[in-house]
Amino acid sequence: MALPSVTALQVENVAFPPTLIKPPASANTLFLGGAGERGLHIQDKFVKFTAIGIYLQDTAVPSLAVKWKGKPVDELTESVQFFRDIVTGPFEKFMQVTMILPLTGQQYSEKVSENCVAIWKHLGIYTDEEGKAIDKFVSVFKDQTFPPGSSILFTVLPKGSLAISFSKDGSIPEVESAVIDNKLLSEAVLESMIGAHGVSPAAKQSLASRLSELFKHHAEV
């Protein structure tokens, strides 16, 4: 099917192109579903740490439109189930996390791990297998440092693998740095960004707004 026609997005000084050809571990071209910053309020000031871009396989639009076309953007933005359907849907996803402020690999992986474990415990699905996957996830980041402008890249494959890659200069590498075969981890990394307690409300708003428009066009086909 034809790739949805979407625009590029800019978050701070990070540009996310409208399409991504064959990200690491994938043979597909993905489109930019949405983007936004992750930040925290520190002493009455909103400090932005990372810019997050979320790309989706073209089949995401018909897959999600069945249930969600015709719903207003604010309803999609507030719907936990809508984002859960993106997280668990049978299509590839790619997340680019680009640093606005510097972070170490340890800082990043520990925070993401915490969020993933919290999600699993809330859903009642935390097992030894997930514990091992988290250990591997943390070890992949152990020796990494991320100055401003560098990126962490995740490819989520529908069969349950999470490919992790790194870029220091904004380019997308052809080959992944590591693959972790754990479906719940691959889903939880994305859920930690856009789920019920996701770290980027701006990315959620962007996804809801852009996908809502794409659903309208899909309905006309």
Curated annotation (Swiss-Prot):
One of its GO terms (biological process) is flavonoid biosynthetic process. GO terms for molecular function: chalcone isomerase activity. InterPro entries: CFI (IPR044164), Chalcone_isomerase (IPR016087), Chalcone_isomerase_3-sand (IPR016088), Chalcone_isomerase_bundle_sf (IPR016089), Chalcone_isomerase_sf (IPR036298). Coiled coil: none annotated. It comes from the Eukaryota. Catalyzes the intramolecular cyclization of bicyclic chalcones into tricyclic (S)-flavanones. Responsible for the isomerization of 4,2',4',6'-tetrahydroxychalcone (also termed chalcone) into naringenin. Belongs to the chalcone isomerase family. This is Chalcone--flavanone isomerase 2.
